[in-house]
Structure formats: C-alpha cells, structure tokens
C-alpha cells in the first residue's frame, strides 16, 4: 500500500470499498478493498485462483487489474481508474442515448465479453454501474470475475439488496448452471436500457423480477423453453402471459436492432445468441 497515496473514497461496491489513489508518478488508480465474510479463515483459495486469471486478461474493453495486494485479512485489487460509468451517463441523457453512441457501447461491451468467454471467464454481475467510460468514448468492463471469486451476493455488504434487474430468468428460477448465456441476458437488458433511457425489468424481488420478464416476453412453456420444468423454482401455476410486440416497449430501435435484442433476451438460455455471433449481427454493419 506504500506505493499509493491520496486515498479518496469513491464508492461502496458489492464486494467492498473503492478508493481513488495515486502512485508516485501521479497516475490514478482505483483500489478495491475486498471485505471477507469469514475473516478468521482468510482469503478463499477460489478467490485467489480467480483473481490470478483476471490478471491475465488483456483487452481494451476490460478494466486492467494491475496489482493484487494480499494483506492479512483483506485483499486490495489495484485497477485502472475511469471517471464515468454507463449508469451515470444514461441518467443524464433523458430518453436514452443517441443510437450511434448506444451501438458503439454495445459493440465494445460485446467485444470485451466475447474475449472473456473465449478465456472461460464469466462476469455474472453485469450492469451499467460496472461499465466504465472514458472521455474518448471507450467502454471498459469492471468487476470481471469477482462475482465468481466471491460468490454472487444476495445483498451488498452495506445491506442494500443487489439489483436483480439484469439477472437471467434461469438464474432467478434457481439454475445452478452458470454459463455464458447469463452474461448475454444482462447485455440485452443493458442494450434496452441504453436505448430506452430506463431499466427494462426493474424488479423489487425475485418473484417480481420474473413476473416483469414474463409480462413482456411471455410466460415460458414447453414450446419456447423445453427444460424450464426442471428448474428448482419453476412453478406450473405461474400466470400465463403472451409476449408483447417489441415495438411497444422498445423505442427508437430499428428492425435489425430489435432482431439482435430479441436474440439476446431469449427466455431459454440455450437459444440466446453468443457474444461472438452478436458481434457479426447485421445491426453493426449499418451506419447509424
């Protein structure tokens, strides 16, 4: 820690406190102090393993992890620092981002996700707050792999409930099979939010979250999701909703954009488009 000075608290994240600090050359970094739930046991070996993988990730759309400081009962992760996140940007852009901006950010997000999925790393907690943006319009994914290293928490350490808005229906219904489609669902939710200027599924509980999804995309059945009945929290008595036309809840997106979004937000995880396939979608071939 002696390398860094001028610590300034800039946030309270899902896994601990985030500080901005400088090194002796005056460069800025983001320091994440990870709180450990079972402090007497020290740092879980899974966390150490995952973080060593994160250090190997090198991509222009992923926040770089420079250093890991292993103190007694805590871990300090030293990341590159960016001033802005996508949530703040959406909040100040009333009615959604300009289409060319949304398209640029979506493509950068998919490029970063595709790279990680190729390296068998899942994010598992994608949301606009975890997407950082610099003044050049570059988007970088933060907190990659931390959800896997420390477990997806039901609550933040500050007792604030972690947002469910970007969580896939398969996870909400108790699926333990974490694979790449859970990140793609989150990307779809973020895409819709960039376009609409507000969250697509702002649920307040697991059940409310599912109902909001079903009311828009329709209730899953054996035709559109053959394995849905196997999920632990699937209820055969779920209310039956028909899917709404996309243009009724997505504004300002052309047909190719809606086609891409619909492929990301498939109820059945096995039917969701991959990040690599999404990058090749005609939506990115058009000029906005």
Swiss-Prot record:
Enzyme class, broadest EC rank: transferase
Record-annotated Protein kinase domain positions: 4-284
InterPro entries: CDK, Kinase-like_dom_sf, Prot_kinase_dom, Protein_kinase_ATP_BS, Ser/Thr_kinase_AS
Residues that coordinate or bind ATP: 10-18, 32
Catalyzed reactions: L-seryl-[protein] + ATP = O-phospho-L-seryl-[protein] + ADP + H(+); L-threonyl-[protein] + ATP = O-phospho-L-threonyl-[protein] + ADP + H(+); [DNA-directed RNA polymerase] + ATP = phospho-[DNA-directed RNA polymerase] + ADP + H(+)
Residues annotated with Phosphothreonine modification: 14, 158
SUPFAM superfamilies registered for this protein in UniProt: Protein kinase-like (PK-like)
Subcellular location: Cytoplasm
One of the protein's GO biological processes: cell division
Swiss-Prot/TrEMBL keywords: ATP-binding, Cell cycle, Cell division, Cytoplasm, Kinase, Magnesium, Metal-binding, Mitosis, Nucleotide-binding, Phosphoprotein, Serine/threonine-protein kinase, Transferase
Gene Ontology CC entries for this record: cytoplasm; nucleus
Protein EC: 2.7.11.22, 2.7.11.23
Cofactor list: Mg(2+)
Active site: 125 (proton acceptor)
DNA damage found in the keyword field: no
UniProt keyword Transit peptide, yes or no: no
Recorded GO MF terms: ATP binding; cyclin-dependent protein serine/threonine kinase activity; metal ion binding; protein serine kinase activity; RNA polymerase II CTD heptapeptide repeat kinase activity
Record text on activity regulation: Phosphorylation at Thr-14 or Tyr-15 inactivates the enzyme, while phosphorylation at Thr-158 activates it.
Residues recorded as bearing Phosphotyrosine in the entry: 15
Subunit details: May form a complex composed of at least the catalytic subunit CRK2 and a cyclin.
Function as written in the Swiss-Prot or TrEMBL entry: Serine/threonine-protein kinase. Involved in the control of the cell cycle. Required for entry into S-phase and mitosis. Probable component of the kinase complex that phosphorylates the repetitive C-terminus of RNA polymerase II.
The family this protein is said to belong to: Belongs to the protein kinase superfamily. CMGC Ser/Thr protein kinase family. CDC2/CDKX subfamily.
Protein name: Cyclin-dependent kinase 2 homolog
Lineage: Eukaryota, Sar, Alveolata, Apicomplexa, Aconoidasida
Gene that encodes the chain: CRK2
């Amino acid at each position: 820690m002696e390398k860094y000075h001028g610590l300034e608290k800039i946030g309270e994240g899902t896994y601990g406190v985030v500080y901005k600090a400088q090194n002796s050359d005056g460069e800025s970094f983001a320091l994440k102090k990870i709180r450990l739930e079972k402090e007497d046991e020290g740092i879980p070996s899974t966390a150490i393993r995952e973080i060593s993988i994160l250090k190997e990730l090198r991509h222009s759309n992923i926040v770089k992890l420079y250093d890991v400081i292993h103190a007694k009962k805590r871990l300090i992760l030293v990341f590159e620092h960016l001033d802005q996140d996508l949530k703040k940007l959406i909040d100040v852009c009333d009615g959604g981002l300009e289409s060319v901006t949304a398209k640029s950010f979506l493509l950068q997000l998919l490029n970063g996700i595709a790279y990680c999925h190729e390296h068998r790393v899942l994010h598992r907690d994608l949301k606009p707050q975890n997407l950082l943006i610099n003044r050049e319009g570059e988007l970088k994914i933060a907190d990659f792999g931390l959800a896997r290293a420390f477990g997806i928490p039901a609550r933040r350490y500050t007792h604030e409930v972690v947002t469910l808005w970007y969580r896939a229906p398969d996870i909400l219904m108790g699926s333990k099979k974490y694979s790449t489609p859970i990140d793609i669902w989150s990307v779809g939710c973020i895409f819709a939010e960039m376009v609409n200027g507000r969250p697509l599924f702002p649920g307040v509980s697991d059940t409310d979250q599912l109902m909001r999804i079903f009311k828009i995309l329709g209730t899953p059945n054996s035709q559109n999701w053959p394995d849905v009945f196997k999920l632990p929290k699937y209820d055969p008595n779920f209310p039956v909703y028909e899917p709404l036309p996309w243009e009724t809840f997505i504004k300002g997106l052309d047909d190719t954009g809606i086609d891409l979004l619909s492929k990301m937000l498939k109820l059945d995880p096995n039917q969701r488009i991959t990040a690599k396939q999404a990058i090749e979608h005609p939506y990115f071939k058009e000029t906005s």
